[in-house]
């Protein structure tokens, strides 16, 4: 299961951002080319292993958008994008996020107290974005039913779980060793 996803990850180039090993992959970066079969595998994986007893799918701009779109199409569940741009809409909530390689503001719109959601993202690595977004949604009274990243890298999953109490599911666990992506496990092996 997830063979195309795994192969595409193994073949992904690595770039350094300071001390951070960053792999460049279509699901996590939108470049060089997004293979619809890989995207479909990812969406089908969330559909199979995620809890979709929700009102809305939530993703974070930018690399969660195509995942949420594909999942929305195959499930019929609408999605909300947490944006990097402020709109000033009524009820908008600003969130400060810090990752291993950037920081900035995110803005939540389209969610209200009592909404049941699944948060989907491309990768959990340092955990900074997920922690900030989960804490903000919890403060808003959003019912977080599930949290899902396509790719798990490093200790980010455990950092998020420790900081928020929410389990983070993933399809594939990877690490960068000697300048290459290595698959350390996948949900289909559990």
UniProtKB/Swiss-Prot annotation:
<dbReference type="InterPro" id="IPR026597">
    <property type="entry name" value="HGPRTase-like"/>
</dbReference>
<keyword id="KW-0328">Glycosyltransferase</keyword>
<dbReference type="InterPro" id="IPR029057">
    <property type="entry name" value="PRTase-like"/>
</dbReference>
<dbReference type="GO" id="GO:0004422">
    <property type="term" value="F:hypoxanthine phosphoribosyltransferase activity"/>
</dbReference>
<dbReference type="GO" id="GO:0005737">
    <property type="term" value="C:cytoplasm"/>
</dbReference>
<dbReference type="InterPro" id="IPR000836">
    <property type="entry name" value="PRibTrfase_dom"/>
</dbReference>
<protein>
    <recommendedName>
        <fullName>Hypoxanthine/guanine phosphoribosyltransferase</fullName>
        <ecNumber>2.4.2.8</ecNumber>
    </recommendedName>
</protein>
<dbReference type="GO" id="GO:0032264">
    <property type="term" value="P:IMP salvage"/>
</dbReference>
<keyword id="KW-0808">Transferase</keyword>
<dbReference type="GO" id="GO:0052657">
    <property type="term" value="F:guanine phosphoribosyltransferase activity"/>
</dbReference>
<comment type="subunit">
    <text>Homodimer.</text>
</comment>
<dbReference type="Pfam" id="PF00156">
    <property type="entry name" value="Pribosyltran"/>
</dbReference>
<dbReference type="InterPro" id="IPR050118">
    <property type="entry name" value="Pur/Pyrimidine_PRTase"/>
</dbReference>
<comment type="pathway">
    <text>Purine metabolism; IMP biosynthesis via salvage pathway; IMP from hypoxanthine: step 1/1.</text>
</comment>
<comment type="similarity">
    <text>Belongs to the purine/pyrimidine phosphoribosyltransferase family. Archaeal HPRT subfamily.</text>
</comment>
<keyword id="KW-0660">Purine salvage</keyword>
<comment type="function">
    <text>Catalyzes a salvage reaction resulting in the formation of IMP that is energically less costly than de novo synthesis.</text>
</comment>
<dbReference type="GO" id="GO:0006166">
    <property type="term" value="P:purine ribonucleoside salvage"/>
</dbReference>
<keyword id="KW-0963">Cytoplasm</keyword>
């Amino acid at each position: 299961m997830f063979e195309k996803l795994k192969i595409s990850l193994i073949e992904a180039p690595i770039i350094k951002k300071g001390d951070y090993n960053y792999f460049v992959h279509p699901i996590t970066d939108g470049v060089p080319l997004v293979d619809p079969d890989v995207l479909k595998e990812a969406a089908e994986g969330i559909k199979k292993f995620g809890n979709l007893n929700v009102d809305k799918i939530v993703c974070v701009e930018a690399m969660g958008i195509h995942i949420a779109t594909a999942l929305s199409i195959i499930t019929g569940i609408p999605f909300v994008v947490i944006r990097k741009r402020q709109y000033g809409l009524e009820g908008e909530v600003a969130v400060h996020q810090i990752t291993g390689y950037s920081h900035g503001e995110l803005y939540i719109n389209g969610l209200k107290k009592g909404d049941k959601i699944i948060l989907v993202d491309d990768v959990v690595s340092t955990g900074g974005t997920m922690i900030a977004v989960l804490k903000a949604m919890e403060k808003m009274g959003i019912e977080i039913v599930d949290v899902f990243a396509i790719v798990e890298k490093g200790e980010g999953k455990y950092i998020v779980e420790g900081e928020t109490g929410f389990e983070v599911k993933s399809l594939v666990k990877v690490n960068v060793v000697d300048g290459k992506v290595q698959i350390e496990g996948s949900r289909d092996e559990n």
